[in-house]
Amino acid sequence: MINPSINTPKSWLAFELNILHRFEFKSIALPFTGNPALGNYLKRGDVRVMANDPLQSAWTRALATIQNNGEKLSDDQVNAVLEDVYVPRHKLLNPALRTWFSETDSWWFDNIKQNLERLQTPLAYAMAASLAMSVGDYVLSFNEHTRELRQPLSNVFRRLWNALPEPVNNGQNNTCQNKNINEFIAELNGIDLMFLRLPATGGVRYDDSDKAAWREEWLRGGNDFWEEFEISRNGKLGAPVETKSQYLRLLEETLRTASHIKKWAIAHVDSGFVSTQDIAEVIGKINRVEAVYTKDFSELTGMKAVIITA
């Protein structure tokens, strides 16, 4: 199961915003959204945000914050989502949950998923699903030595709901899509800036410790979709590759698809597989490289963040 996008560490958000604030733009495209925090912050500056991610879980979280300009979950909606969530049925509708959670926790997530269908709007569904995904991340943050410190999951859901910030209404028609990257980029019109977080190099694959994998399996209702998902990524930026030249070829194809967009900011993790110079040379074939910004996070993460503007 491949990892099509990269979730940058939270400490990099300030770096990304610092670079983006140096430019004037009223609209931005995020082909790989991952964490929606950047898009949500940009909305505060009245920027129109066009977000996308091939993962349904990332797309759902983006809907809840980026596309949502004002809708909030009500008490009644939260009560409906949490109704009878610990009551087991004949069998789990999503047995893949047992890969990640205990039997009791699996029932909670299985029932939550079914209760989401009671919500009347796509944004309400996305907000409640995002809260449930945060609860799952909370559960997976404990180990056998700290598990006794956990709170009941329904209590955690309510606490997260009560802590939600007010939706940011920037008065813009922000959109979120769940498409492959080249299709999303090709359909963009009138966008001032593309901020492209490059996917992990070297064909990183999900394993049983990858939080993004459990979210996707929970939201899709099982784990039998991965083969089809891999096929849909084949030959596109984000697919697993064996060589540097393969990665750079896929990057070039994507950037040529984006040649109609005025300005680019390309975020890259300098991990050694593909160098910043390699990426800058590919960008330079299509657009003029203006600047390269770097931030060393090696003491925290062992990596260096790079943003190339063109």
State what each model feature region is:
Residues 12-13, 18, 100-211, 220-237:
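SAM-dependent nucleic-acid methyltransferase catalytic core
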Residues 150, 158, 273-310:
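Class I S-adenosyl-L-methionine
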Residues 237-287:
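Conserved Class I SAM-dependent methyltransferase catalytic core
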Residues 55:
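Conserved SAM/SAH-binding beta-strand->alpha-helix loop
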Residues 63-77, 160-171:
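Short, conserved SAM-binding/catalytic segment
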